[in-house]
């Protein structure tokens, strides 16, 4: 399904764009292309590594497809935005993440524990070599990152890569504590075995985005948890509720 949705639809989109003379594209890529990093923080020059899942492979491949597209036709203007871990919701509470079934992503799961739909948060492993965790970024910061990229790319051609993150790693336990502050109660959690493929830490160097586009993340982990909790309270059963 990832291959059909991501690869197939991207090829269709590029073909339509080419037929209509539109050669400017911003691609929502992912930090998954870096794999298990050799060193931190991750810069845009950090090596790409083989993906560990189909989602990561599609991002890896689409980056290559768009790079090849520019090589074949230098008039193309391609910006690859490598997201780290988008979380949060719009501060109004009108827009948020509404997973179907059991959430695969951390923050919606934590929010459902806080609202009483799940028993506890599962923390996979407490034996990491570093307390640092993943780089979480507020969805509103991603939106301003896209706006900054649109302004930056105007009149240019080429292929450019930008990391979008906060530059700080946050552990799952730190997320749980921050969400507990947001909802006003201690959230239950249990330590489970570490999952294969989980990395010790993964966070960005976003200095290039600040230097080139004038962009940097504004929201903190507490802001992300507050806005996610606000959305969950206004939509306890999701949009269909």
Which residues does each predicted region cover?
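Catalytic helix-loop patch of NAD(P)-dependent Rossmann-fold dehydrogenases
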Residues: 4-12, 19, 23-24, 33-85, ...
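Conserved mid-core alpha-helix of short-chain dehydrogenase/reductase
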Residues: 11-16, 141-144
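Active-site loop of short-chain dehydrogenase/reductase
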Residues: 21-25, 75-77, 119-120, 156-160
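Residue(s) in the substrate-gating loop at a strand-loop-helix junction
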Residues: 30
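Glycine-rich "substrate-gating" loop/helix at the edge of Rossmann-like oxidoreductase active sites
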Residues: 52, 87-103, 126-140, 168
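Mobile, glycine-enriched helix-loop/loop "lid" segments at the mouths of ligand-binding/catalytic clefts
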Residues: 93-121
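C-terminal substrate-binding subdomain of Rossmann-fold SDR/epimerase-dehydratase oxidoreductases
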Residues: 112-241
């Amino acid at each position: 399904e990832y291959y059909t949705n991501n690869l197939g639809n991207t090829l269709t989109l590029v073909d339509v764009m080419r037929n209509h003379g539109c050669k400017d594209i911003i691609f929502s890529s992912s930090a998954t292309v870096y794999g298990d990093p050799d060193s931190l923080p991750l810069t845009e020059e950090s090596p790409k590594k083989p993906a560990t899942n189909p989602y990561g492979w599609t991002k890896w491949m689409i980056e290559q497809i768009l790079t090849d597209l520019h090589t074949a036709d230098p008039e193309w203007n391609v910006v690859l935005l490598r997201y780290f871990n988008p979380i949060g919701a719009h501060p109004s509470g009108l827009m948020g993440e509404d997973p179907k079934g059991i959430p695969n992503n951390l923050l919606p799961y934590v929010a459902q524990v806080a609202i009483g739909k799940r028993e506890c948060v599962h923390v996979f492993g407490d034996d990491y070599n570093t307390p640092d965790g993943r780089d979480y970024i507020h969805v509103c910061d991603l939106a301003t990152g896209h706006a900054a990229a649109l302004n930056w790319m105007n009149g240019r051609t080429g292929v450019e890569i930008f990391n979008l993150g906060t530059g700080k790693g946050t552990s799952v336990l730190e997320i749980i504590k921050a969400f507990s502050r947001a909802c006003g109660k201690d959230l239950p959690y249990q330590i489970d075995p570490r999952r294969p493929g989980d990395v010790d830490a993964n966070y960005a160097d976003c200095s290039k985005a600040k230097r080139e586009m004038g962009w940097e993340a504004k929201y903190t982990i507490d802001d992300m948890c507050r806005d996610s909790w606000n959305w969950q309270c206004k939509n306890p059963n999701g949009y269909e509720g």
